[in-house]
Amino acid sequence: MNRRMTALAAGLCAALAVPAQAAPEMSLARFECGTPQAPTPVNQRFSDTYAYGDLKLQFVYSCYLVKHGDDYLLWDTGHAMTAPNVAPKVSLVDLLAKINLKPDQIKYVGISHFHADHTGQAASFPKSTLLIGQGDWDVLTSAKPPGNANPAPFASWIKGDGKVEPVPQDKDVFGDGSVIMLYTPGHTPGHHSLLVKLPQMGPVFISGDLMHFHENYDTNGVPSFNTDRAQTLASLDRAKKIVAANKATVVIQHDARDVDKLPAFPAAAK
């Protein structure tokens, strides 16, 4: 018995002596993925209760790069380079080149939803695994997608040339809880937001288009063009609880007032 206990104790000591695996290096960078236009009225289009009066806001078009160890997630791909008036001044491929990254180094392209200002440059990353909400993927691959869902940027994945993972609910992207795609439907059927837990800055909640500006978020405003009002309100409620529970910084992708919450590219939050 004593020999057995001694052997067990020795094994336990050996196990405890194995150093814990170091947490992967993480960072979050913002790209400008479209050309902002003059401030525009938001009352009717962005509130189905006409809540915003004469409010005018300038919209920005944000994409994000998450570094997780040696892996990268690109969150949204902005406007196409051919988009009239709002096309980016610099392509995502050229922006990535500034930090010595090539398209085939991007492991995942995560899409918040299927609208053109979030999907325009997806085709530049055909070797990346596409992460997109199941509901949105179903729309894109349907016989007659609606006009606001353009399948063209996803042609390689639709044909089966690239790997796609339709996401029906939440997805722990890297398997360690540090980057989570959050199911927040309502704006589109499969809409997702993103929670990134940075070691220094702390958790960051990236909205997608769950809300377009802080007045949307603060008042539970529902745009008139959302696909489901009840889902939108439920998603806003869930998002606020996630933000509170994680003490997360809220970054609204289209709100120009949130651009400075992250360092200016090529710097990144850590």
Where are these regions (language model features)?
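Bacterial N-terminal signal peptides that target proteins for export
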Residues: 1-9
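Metallo-beta-lactamase
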Residues: 16-105, 134-183, 201-208, 244, ...
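Short acidic/His/Gly/Ser-rich catalytic and metal-binding motifs that mark active-site loops
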Residues: 39-41, 82-84, 139-141, 214-217
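Short, electropositive alpha-helical surface patch
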Residues: 82-83, 91-92, 131, 186, ...
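Active-site metal-binding motif and surrounding structural segment of the metallo-beta-lactamase
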Residues: 85-132
